[in-house]
Regions:
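Basic, glycine/lysine-rich polyanion-binding surfaces/domains
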Residues: 1-182
């Protein structure tokens, strides 16, 4: 959320059609996550249907469902429908909150980019190529040459790793080192 204003501005530079408008949808859309082995059954009971494979999108009356992986589906629900959708899902599954969803994102290898870490990494440093977050065959985008060169040379200066730390978390973007791994 702290990178949203800058991201909207940057994306706005690439809008080439007058009918395309970028805007902050935080007051219009509510994000809900459904996860676990019962996620598909909960969505069937909700009546949304289930996107068939990773990153497939399915629109339904109250919003949109995006399949993130085998057991995680994100719903972008119209704000006026969020409470009824939440109540129905809560009757079908156990609500666990944002910390549990963040843990699932970490377990899936999804990087969390903040203002402190924005523009600090090429996609390979954040492991985006490992989770299908970057294509080396489609599109044209700023920095594509560097991303492709990194891929084909096979040299990534640093990588993102999952770690479990005791005590307080260091600030975002802090380099961590292990004496066992030079």
């Amino acid at each position: 959320s702290d990178i949203q204003p800058g991201m909207l501005k940057k994306l706005g530079m690439y809008v080439l059609r007058s009918k395309v408008k970028l805007s902050d949808a935080n007051s219009d859309i509510v994000l809900l996550g459904v996860a676990g082995t019962g996620a598909a059954a909960a969505l069937k009971a909700l009546g949304t249907g289930i996107p068939s494979s990773q990153y497939d999108v399915l629109r339904f009356e109250e919003g949109t469902a995006i399949r993130l992986d085998e057991h995680r589906i994100q719903l972008a629900v119209h704000a006026n429908a969020a409470v009824p959708v939440w109540n129905k899902l809560a009757s079908l599954a156990s609500p666990v909150g944002t910390p549990a969803w963040r843990w699932l994102e970490i377990a899936a290898g999804v990087p969390h980019i903040t203002l402190a870490t924005q523009e600090e990494f090429v996609p390979q440093m954040a492991n985006l190529e490992l989770i299908g977050g970057v294509s080396f065959t489609k599109g044209c985008y700023p920095g594509q040459e560097i991303v492709a060169r990194t891929k084909y040379l096979g040299k990534v200066k640093r990588r993102t790793y999952r770690a479990h730390l005791e005590g307080d978390c260091p600030p975002a973007g802090t380099d961590l080192f292990s004496p066992d791994l030079p």
